Swiss-Prot record:
Pfam families: MSSS, MutS_V, Smr. ATP binds at G335, P336, N337, T338, G339, G340, K341, T342. This is Endonuclease MutS2. GO terms for biological process: mismatch repair; negative regulation of DNA recombination; rescue of stalled ribosome. Homodimer. Binds to stalled ribosomes, contacting rRNA. PANTHER family: OS10G0509000 PROTEIN, OS10G0509000 PROTEIN-RELATED. PROSITE patterns: DNA_MISMATCH_REPAIR_2, SMR. Endonuclease that is involved in the suppression of homologous recombination and thus may have a key role in the control of bacterial genetic diversity. Acts as a ribosome collision sensor, splitting the ribosome into its 2 subunits. Detects stalled/collided 70S ribosomes which it binds and splits by an ATP-hydrolysis driven conformational change. Acts upstream of the ribosome quality control system (RQC), a ribosome-associated complex that mediates the extraction of incompletely synthesized nascent chains from stalled ribosomes and their subsequent degradation. Probably generates substrates for RQC. Belongs to the DNA mismatch repair MutS family. MutS2 subfamily. It is an enzyme of class 3 (hydrolase). Its EC number is 3.1.-.-, 3.6.4.-. GO terms for molecular function: ATP binding; ATP hydrolysis activity; ATP-dependent DNA damage sensor activity; endonuclease activity; mismatched DNA binding; ribosomal large subunit binding; rRNA binding. InterPro entries: DNA_mismatch_repair_MutS_C, DNA_mismatch_repair_MutS_core, DNA_mismatch_repair_MutS_sf, MSSS, MutS, MutS2, P-loop_NTPase, Smr_dom.
C-alpha cells in the first residue's frame, strides 16, 4: 500500500488517535509502524486479535498491562557485560510482574470458557520468572533506590549510619540549645557543607567551637563550621557512606549478573507484552468509536451499513450505506459540488485501510469490507509547484501512474474525474478512464459534476449511478448517499428559494432541452421513491433487530428454566432418598428385633419373610435422577428441505422451514414470527399419520360449525358471558381440545369477568393468557377436560 494514499486518506491521523489508547511506549511504537496488510489471512488474523481484545475489554473492563516499559536497551547492556542501575533493574522487574499478572489474567479467562484462541496462544508464550521478580522487588523500589532488604550487610551499614548521624545531630543540637547560641550563631539551624554537618557561626566567634571551617556567607559575616567535637563522628559517617556505596554497587552487579542469564526470556516477554498493549489499544479505540469487526471479503465485495467517517464528529456525521462488488464494480457519483461526494470517497478508502490494519470500523454489525492488494486515490489538488504542472496535468500524471499499476485486486478512488479542462473533453476522458479501469478488473468509485456521466451508470452493466442528497428547503446537502440515483441540478429550485423572479426561472427552463428537463424530473421521482423505500427498510431492520433480541432473551430464559428444573428435581430426589434411608434404618431396627424374638422362640416368623421384606424396602429407595435428557438412538441425519416440519430445540417450539440461507442457517416460520435459526438448533419432525376420526353424533342447530376462536371485542359484559357459555357448548360438540377467546386488553374488566367464569366451568381443564405470538394477555386459551 502506497504511503501517499495513506496520507491522502489521512490514515496517519487515525494512528495518532490510536496512540492515545496505548499504555506504553512499546504499544505506541507498534502503532507508529502500523500499515495495512494485503494478505487476506493476515488481515483475518489481525481482525480476530482485535475482536478477542474487545471481548476481554467487554468482560473485564481493562487488562493488567500498566507498568510495562521498553527495556530493550537495558538488555543490550547486560548482553555486553555491563551493569544496570537501580531504576533499570526496577523496570525489568516491573515487566516481569506484568508478565506474571497478564498470564494469570488470561488463564482465568480461559478457565471459565472464554474463547481466545489467538490471545490465549500469545499468553502461553509468556514465561513467569517469579524468583527473579521477587529478588528485584526486595532489592530496589520504583525510584531505583536500593532497599535495606537487599542484603544483611547493607541493612547493618545503614542502621549504623543512621545511629552515627543521630549522634552528630544530637551534639550539634546541644550547641543550638545553648544559652549563648543566639549571640554566637547566625541562625539556629544545622546544615550541610561538603557533605558534612555544620552550624552557622558569626565571624567574631569562630574560635569558640574549634574545628573546621567549610564555607562562609557572601558577606563573610557567617562561617559554616564543623565543631571539633563532631569531626570524628562525621569522619565515621563518611566511612560508612563509602561502605554503603560499595555494598550497593555489589548488589546491583549481582542482580545484573543474575538477569544476564534470562536476557532472551525477558526480551521475548517484553515483546509479547508490547503486542498485548497494541491489541488492547486497538480494542479500546474501537470501543470509543462504537466500531464493529467487519466481515471480510476476498472477492471485492463491500457492503458497509451506516458507515461513518472516523475523523468527523460522531454526533454530526451522516452515516451511509455503501455497497460495491456484487451487482456492480463501478459507482459514479454525479451532481453539483454541494459537498459530501469527496467525504464518501474518503470514508470508503479510510475504512478499507483501517480494516486491513486490523482495526474495527465505525459502521453497524454485519458490515462487509473487501481486502485489496492496492488502494489508489486521486483526491484533491495534488498540484506540484516544483514541476509547474497545472491542476489537470497533476491529476492526469497521477491517473497515468494508477492505470500503470492497477490490477483486479485494486480499489480506485477518483475525485472530480476529468476536471480542470474543457467540459466536453473532460467528460469524454472520464468515460474512457473508467472503461480502462474496469478493463483492468478494478473496483472503482468516482465523483464528477459532468452531467454527461449520468448515462454511464445506465449504459454499462458493471456500473451504477449515485448522488448526494440535497435539501432544497434548507439550501444545503444532507450528505446522504443515494446509490442508484444520479445527481441532478438544483439550480432552478435554489434560485427560486433565494428570491429570483419566476419569469426569469421560466425563461431559463425553456432554454433547457426537453430531455434534460425530463431526466431531472425522473431523478427527482427516483429520490422520493428511494427515500420512502429506505424509511421502510430502516423500520423493517429495527423490527428484525428487536425480534433477534427477543429470541436471545427467550433462549436465555429457557436455559434458566431447564437449569432450575434440573436443580429442583435433584433436590427432590435427594430429599426422597434421605426419607427412604431413614425408613430403611428404622426397618433394619424392627427386623433386628423380630429376628431376636424369633431366636428366643417368641414368634413364628420365617427368615425368608424377613429377607423379602428387607429387599422390598431396599427397592423402595429412589435412585438419583439423572438430569441428562435420554438420547434417542442415533439415526441417519435428515437432509432438511423447504416445507419440513421442525422443532427449534433452544425454544422448544415447532415451526416450518421456509428457505435455506446457508448450510448453517435456515429461515423458519414459528407461528406468526419468521426467524433465522442455526441448522444445529433444528430437529426434524416426522409428518403425523392421519388418525381415524371419531364419529360423534350430536344434535344441534343447523348453521355454521363452531370456530376455534371467539372474538368478544366490543361486546357488553353480560352479552359477552352469554356468548361464551353458548360457544363453549358448541366447541365441545365440535371436538376441539382447546379454543381461544379474544377479549382484548382494554381496561381489563371483560378479561377479568371471562376468566372468573371459565375458572368455574365444569368442562374447563385449564386456562392461560396467550403467548406473544398468540396475542398476549388480550387472548385467553381454554383447554377442555
Amino acid at each position: 500500500m502506497e504511503k501517499k494514499v495513506e496520507a491522502i486518506l489521512e490514515f496517519d491521523k487515525i494512528k495518532k488517535q490510536l496512540t492515545e489508547f496505548a499504555s506504553s511506549s512499546l504499544g505506541e511504537q507498534a502503532i507508529l509502524e502500523l500499515a495495512p496488510a494485503t494478505d487476506f489471512q493476515v488481515v483475518q488474523k489481525t481482525q480476530l486479535e482485535t475482536e478477542e481484545g474487545a471481548k476481554i475489554i467487554r468482560l473485564r473492563g481493562s487488562a493488567p498491562i500498566t507498568g510495562l516499559t521498553d527495556v530493550f536497551a537495558h538488555l543490550k547492556r547486560l548482553e555486553i557485560g555491563g551493569d544496570l542501575n537501580g531504576l533499570e533493574i526496577y523496570q525489568i522487574g516491573s515487566n516481569l510482574r506484568v508478565s506474571r499478572q497478564m498470564k494469570n489474567f488470561m488463564n482465568d479467562l480461559l478457565e471459565i470458557g472464554v474463547e481466545l484462541p489467538l490471545l490465549g496462544a500469545l499468553s502461553d508464550e509468556l514465561l513467569v520468572l517469579k524468583e527473579v521478580e521477587e529478588d528485584i522487588a526486595i532489592s530496589v523500589d520504583e525510584s531505583g533506590k536500593v532497599l535495606d532488604t537487599a542484603s544483611e550487610a547493607l541493612s547493618t551499614i545503614r542502621r549504623t549510619l543512621r545511629r552515627t548521624e543521630d549522634r552528630v545531630r544530637e551534639k550539634l543540637e546541644s550547641y543550638l540549645r545553648d544559652r549563648n547560641a543566639s549571640k554566637m550563631l547566625s541562625d539556629a539551624v544545622i546544615t550541610i557543607r561538603n557533605d558534612r554537618y555544620v552550624i552557622p557561626v558569626k565571624q567574631e566567634y569562630k574560635g569558640h567551637y574549634g574545628g573546621i571551617v567549610h564555607d562562609q556567607s557572601a558577606s563573610g559575616q557567617t562561617l559554616f563550621i564543623e565543631p571539633q567535637s563532631v569531626v570524628d563522628l562525621n569522619n565515621e559517617r563518611k566511612a560508612l557512606q563509602a561502605k554503603e556505596k560499595q555494598e550497593i554497587e555489589r548488589i546491583l552487579a549481582e542482580i545484573s549478573a543474575s538477569l544476564a542469564a534470562w536476557i532472551n526470556e525477558i526480551h521475548h516477554n517484553t515483546f509479547i507484552l508490547g503486542r498485548f498493549d497494541f491489541i488492547f489499544a486497538k480494542a479500546r479505540f474501537g470501543k470509543a468509536m462504537k466500531a464493529v469487526t467487519p466481515h471480510l471479503s476476498d472477492a471485492g465485495v463491500v457492503h458497509l451499513i451506516a458507515a461513518r467517517h472516523p475523523l468527523l464528529d460522531a454526533a454530526k456525521v451522516v452515516a451511509n450505506d455503501i455497497y460495491l462488488g456484487e451487482d456492480f464494480t463501478t459507482i459514479v457519483i454525479t451532481g453539483p459540488n454541494t459537498g459530501g461526494k469527496t467525504i464518501t470517497l474518503k470514508t470508503l478508502g479510510l475504512l478499507t485501510l483501517m480494516a486491513q490494519s486490523g482495526l474495527q470500523i465505525p459502521a453497524q454489525e454485519d458490515s462487509t469490507i473487501a481486502v485489496f492488494e492496492h488502494v489508489f486515490a486521486d483526491i484533491g489538488d495534488e498540484q506540484s509547484i516544483e514541476q509547474s504542472l497545472s491542476t489537470f496535468s497533476s491529476h492526469m500524471t497521477n491517473i497515468v501512474s494508477i492505470l500503470g499499476n492497477v490490477n483486479q485486486k485494486s480499489l480506485i478512488l477518483y475525485d472530480e474525474l476529468g476536471a480542470g479542462t474543457d467540459p466536453q473533453e473532460g467528460a469524454a476522458l472520464a468515460i474512457a478512464i473508467l472503461d480502462a479501469s474496469h478493463a483492468k478488473g478494478a473496483s472503482v468509485v468516482a465523483t464528477t459534476h459532468y452531467p454527461e456521466l449520468k448515462a454511464y451508470g445506465y449504459n454499462r452493466v458493471h456500473a451504477t449511478n449515485a448522488s448526494v442528497e440535497f435539501n432544497v428547503e434548507t439550501l444545503s446537502p444532507t450528505y446522504k448517499l443515494l446509490i442508484g440515483v444520479p445527481g441532478r441540478s438544483n439550480a432552478f429550485d435554489i434560485s427560486r428559494r433565494l428570491g429570483l423572479s419566476e419569469n426569469i426561472i421560466t425563461e431559463a427552463r425553456s432554454l433547457v432541452d426537453t430531455e434534460s428537463a425530463d431526466l431531472n424530473d425522473m431523478i427527482s421521482s427516483l429520490e422520493e421513491k428511494r427515500n420512502l423505500a429506505e424509511t421502510e427498510y430502516e423500520e423493517a431492520r429495527e423490527l428484525a433487530r428487536g425480534a433477534d433480541n427477543l429470541l436471545k432473551d427467550l433462549q436465555k430464559e429457557i436455559s434458566n428454566y431447564y437449569q432450575q428444573k434440573d436443580k429442583l428435581i435433584e433436590q427432590a430426589s435427594e430429599k426422597a432418598a434421605t426419607i427412604v434411608e431413614k425408613a430403611e434404618a428404622e426397618a433394619e431396627e424392627i427386623i433386628h428385633e423380630l429376628r431376636t424374638m424369633q431366636l428366643n422362640g417368641a414368634a413364628g416368623i420365617k427368615e425368608h419373610e424377613l429377607i423379602d421384606a428387607k429387599t422390598r424396602l431396599g427397592n423402595a429407595k429412589p435412585k438419583t435422577i439423572n438430569k441428562t435428557i435420554p438420547q434417542a438412538p442415533k439415526q441417519k441425519p435428515h437432509v432438511f428441505q423447504e416445507g419440513d416440519n421442525v422443532r427449534v430445540l433452544s425454544l422448544g417450539q415447532k415451526g416450518t422451514l421456509l428457505n435455506k440461507i446457508s448450510d448453517k442457517e435456515w429461515n423458519v416460520q414459528i407461528g406468526i414470527i419468521k426467524m433465522k435459526i442455526k441448522t444445529t438448533d433444528l430437529e426434524y419432525i416426522q409428518p403425523e399419520k392421519p388418525k381415524k376420526q371419531r364419529i360423534i353424533t350430536s344434535v344441534h342447530s343447523s348453521g355454521s360449525p363452531a370456530k376455534s376462536e371467539l372474538d368478544l371485542r366490543g361486546e357488553r359484559y353480560e352479552d359477552a358471558l352469554q356468548k361464551v357459555d353458548k360457544y363453549l357448548d358448541e366447541a365441545l360438540l365440535a371436538g376441539y381440545p382447546q379454543v381461544a377467546i379474544i377479549h382484548g386488553k382494554g381496561t381489563g374488566a371483560l378479561r377479568t369477568g371471562v376468566t372468573e367464569y371459565l375458572k368455574n366451568h365444569r368442562m374447563v381443564k385449564s386456562i392461560r393468557f396467550g403467548a406473544a405470538a398468540e396475542g398476549g394477555n388480550g387472548v385467553t386459551i381454554v383447554e377442555f377436560k
